[in-house]
Amino acid sequence: MPLLLPELLCPAGDEAALRAAVDSGANAVYLGYRVFGARASAVNFDAEALEAAVRYAHLYHVRVYVTVNTLVKPGEMQDLHAALGEIAATGADAAIVQDLGVAAMVRREFPALALHASTQMAICNAEGARLARSLGFSRVVLARECSLEDAHAVAETGIETEVFVHGALCTAVSGRCLMSSMSGGRSGNRGRCAQPCRQGFRMDGMQGPLLSLRDLCLLDDLPVLCASGVRSLKVEGRLKSPEYVAVVTSVYRRALDAVAQGNFRPDPVQREQLLQIFNRGGFTRGHILGAEDVDLVTPDRVSHEGLPLGKVQAVKGRLAALHVDRALHDGDSLQLRGAGESYDLRYSGPDIPAGGTASLRLRPDAKAKPGMQVARLADALQLERARAHAPRPIPVSMAARFAQGQPMTLTLTDGEVSVTVTGPVVDTAKSRPSTEVDARRQLDKLGGTPFALEEESRLQVMVDEGIFLPVSALNALRRDAVERLIRMRTEAFASSGRPLGHDALSAAHARPHPDSPIGPDTLAVIFSDPALAEGLAQAGATLLCFAPRTFTPEALSRDLPRLPRGAWLRLPPQMTQRTQDACLAVIRAHADRLGGVMAESVGQLGLSLPLPVLAGEGVPATNPMGVETVRALGACGFVLWPEWTFSEQKGLTPLPLPALLKVYGRETLMLLNHCPERVRRGLRHGRADCALCTDEAMVCAKADPTLTDRLGYRFPLTRTRFPEGCELSVLGALPTDLRSRDADRRALGAGMLLHFTVESPREQQSLTRTYAALLSGAPCAPAAFETTLGHWARGVE
């Protein structure tokens, strides 16, 4: 069976980047519209520019996917409808979507748009993929934390799968980041991430960008990915330059073509091209191919590393003699690096071959010394070549017939689409008759068009003797054929990719709405120690929700019987397919003791469990259509999204589904799949069997460690143990406390949710009693410790 080569999907932050991607060999591009895209700082496209982009891409048989992948506020649904209508009118092929409400609107109102589930939906297993299909999605962009095994399991469900192969990686588990939002009001879920994960932190003697990941590069692993059933290979970079897009696209195009031909070999020259155009401390193979800890994180640099160029040999005044290990070109951007200092420079002078010595003029403030390293940040020759990309000529064939007394006819075909045009009636020559050579000379003039006659045999001309063919008529005939083929080729390609339409929510996942245990008088408490359950119930909790710190079959078999009958279980936001299957078997075995489960990812709404399901914060029901989708999937309630203000939340009322408002608790700002302590120790293997946290000599074994930012805010880290290793939660520096806004909660008609993480047993019971009293109408004193209102009053961009 021949190998089905995956699609190469490349970024287009603006028109120049789009043309670079198309011209360099992309099979598809993804880009942002003027609103509701997750890269608000990119140039993006308005309706007119998007329509032109779609025409250009479709002419070259390149698909266009538009990101509509932010979370949408209740008051923005009318603007969303208008934007989706404009996008659909351009003929774009698909919308990449995170928000369940956006998906519902596309499904109902704009069925010509295919739906792709954004990586922010955190689909990472087969159950999530099946749920996505039931919601009308034809493709899922897998969570970046997926293993190759998980990717294969998802592909086996029949849905198209897309994985990232190159570019920047988010530190946080997909769809689970509030760090930028809570730190400065710029929400990554709204396309305005300020990248606080690239900033410096301190932890237990370590200092630096402890959360900053290397860039992903799976160039050498393309054969494995192609054999896995993955349908699309995605390059990150809508904020990158057109030159970056051209270089990365062309490298991956050549490599994929080699895979298709069966002669792929890892090419160090191509890899060096990728390193030169951009890298952060080298590359990582990412979670999908098993990279761990120090192979993921680059704790030294967050900006472009460049490539080593050479060392300073001698310094005289403002001139440095530089021995170069690579060829140096006029206009190269360089960086002189010493201990704790660096200076950006630009080389101006003759090209120097590898092994030669260059004279480098220094900036007045540059303190150069012999032995200092010099890196090249930008290769002027590479950039010049990248800018020289041109559209790929589309091979065509022509057949012309010029018969006396008959209209001129010309057929132009690209092998799939053919057009035939006619011209004026052919007259008898009054002087010199026209020849086949004359006709060929005019018809062959395809310069300035997308088409090319690659061989002379592709132009067949039949000319009667004694006729006259005006040059103007031949040119007009050719132009007419070209214009019609452009139009027909574009329309045929666009229609070939359109979905047949979206069905209503699949009956396999549409469930009857159960009687809900959630109401305005509910006091729900999330806790992690089974021994505290009875005390929390006595303190006034009406719904107990256990969030295990160890989520393994063995631990669940031990802990679930210790819970009071009717307690709920909070599922972790992320589980591998193998862990989920094993743990669900234990949950089903104890289902008679449990009151229900709290789902913390969209995919978990599709799990087959004989229990009520409550949609937690990990299932962002952020607008009325999103809440309605959650309701249709059988959830008995949901937790209000923490980024909306009270006035924005009022757009959900009257609530179509019972809701809880988190009135106390530290927000989970990030979920990490790497461990800073293991990074500090230089560990790259053994995450599954790691025992550092059980070593009494370890600081993190005695108490939850903390990350401290440059402003002195301390962010606690908590661990959840899985068979494959730990997942760390980065918690807010301050707990959210909405006791002073209880009138708002009552106006919404929502119950209370307390989420305990680092609080002591005594603090948990005390806080539960406080909120139970508040729920009964008793006055409540302010907290005796520092808290925050979160986004309840200030909102997010």
Task: Label every PLM stretch briefly.
Residues 126-127:
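Conserved nucleotide-cofactor-binding alpha/beta core module
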